């Protein structure tokens, strides 16, 4: 067998390949069969992870800004707009450690009008999964699934979500290969109890037992081997958010008893995310935390910066950090702040991340992954 890199021992060549930044994966794979097999091997990614070479990325389904879209967006150049006249959504990437922003390649063959409105996003391994939402050209609910592979640099279609086309459902992944979906509402505005799981590698959906309660506009997080579905409301109480949650044990394949006091009544669960040691959420003025000790009390841990208090979108980052993207006023540009871990007894500090104008649009969904 030929060496990976002529003139170098294979162990040295592998060390070189593992240091290629993720945007270069596609080019490296195209060099030769040996390099492609090397990058596709589990050992390659284990070496990267073990050597601290992985990169933390935040993927954001974000609207394009009118002032910048004309110069940077193929979607805008093709004049693809939602029927409402709003700017199209695309997938933006942010590296919190370097502060750099970028776009994922567009998928004109699969998503000619941009990302679906109100879609959900989840990360599994080196793939990013986009699920459901509304067709931007018709506002019809979609059951489509699209997958971006960071290794190949390509988009592909996944198996569509089975059952009634649902909107505003809970969604989360185990970060490995499975995406969970639950609740939402059907085309008749009926809140749903049904749930299912999607195996990304097999491209297969499997039904899960129904939840105990109907949950429209609920939030999904994955923590401690369980898919936690928080809040939402029933058909009869439309728009009146409840405070309970229930969790699906992925190993035992059953739902836990309903936790009746997961949230304060009337609080939208959109900003609820799972951190290293518990759950975070954003109120109108603070970030609150609920630990894993079993207590139901939410405690304020930091005041929310005024620049991100409107329509905040929260993302838990490795190392006990929390990223919040939001605006100071309706229709205003979105800012980005990162809440750093506690340093002794001092208040947890915020670090403001620079946001270029073209990445200051509204964020409708987000997730964190490591490549």
Question: How would you label these PLM feature ranges?
Answer:
Residues 1-371:
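Kelch-like beta-propeller repeat domains
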């Amino acid at each position: 067998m030929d060496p990976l890199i002529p003139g170098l021992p294979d162990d040295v060549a592998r060390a070189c390949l593992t240091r290629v930044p993720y945007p270069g994966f596609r080019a490296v794979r195209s060099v030769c069969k040996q390099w492609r097999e090397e990058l596709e091997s589990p050992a390659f990614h284990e070496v990267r992870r073990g050597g601290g070479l992985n990169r933390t990325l935040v993927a954001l389904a974000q609207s394009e800004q009118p002032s910048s879209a004309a110069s940077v967006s193929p979607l805008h150049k093709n004049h693809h707009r939602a029927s409402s006249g709003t700017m199209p959504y695309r997938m933006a990437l942010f590296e919190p450690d370097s502060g750099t922003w970028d776009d994922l390649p567009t998928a004109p063959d699969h998503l000619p009008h941009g990302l679906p409105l109100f879609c959900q996003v989840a990360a599994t391994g080196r793939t990013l999964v986009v699920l459901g939402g509304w067709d931007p050209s018709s506002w019809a609910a979609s059951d489509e699934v699209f997958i971006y592979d960071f290794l190949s640099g390509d988009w592909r279609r996944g198996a569509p979500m089975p059952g009634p086309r649902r909107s505003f459902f809970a969604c989360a992944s185990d970060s490995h290969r499975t995406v969970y979906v639950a609740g939402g509402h059907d085309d008749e505005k009926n809140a749903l109890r049904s749930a299912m799981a999607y195996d990304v590698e097999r491209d297969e959906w499997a039904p899960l037992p129904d939840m105990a309660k109907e949950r429209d506009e609920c939030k999904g997080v994955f923590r401690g081997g369980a898919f936690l579905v928080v809040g939402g409301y029933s058909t009869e109480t439309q728009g009146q958010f409840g405070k309970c949650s229930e969790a699906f044990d992925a190993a035992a394949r059953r739902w836990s008893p309903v936790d009746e006091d997961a949230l304060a009544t009337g609080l939208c669960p959109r900003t609820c995310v799972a951190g290293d040691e518990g759950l975070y959420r954003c109120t109108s003025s603070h970030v609150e935390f609920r630990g894993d000790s079993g207590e139901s009390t939410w405690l304020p841990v930091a005041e929310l910066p005024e620049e991100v208090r409107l329509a905040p979108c929260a993302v838990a980052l490795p190392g006990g950090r929390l990223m919040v993207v939001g605006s100071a006023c309706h229709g205003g540009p979105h800012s980005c702040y990162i809440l750093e871990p506690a340093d002794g007894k001092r208040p947890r500090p915020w670090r403001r991340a620079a946001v270029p104008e073209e990445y200051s649009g509204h964020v409708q969904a987000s997730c964190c992954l490591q490549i």
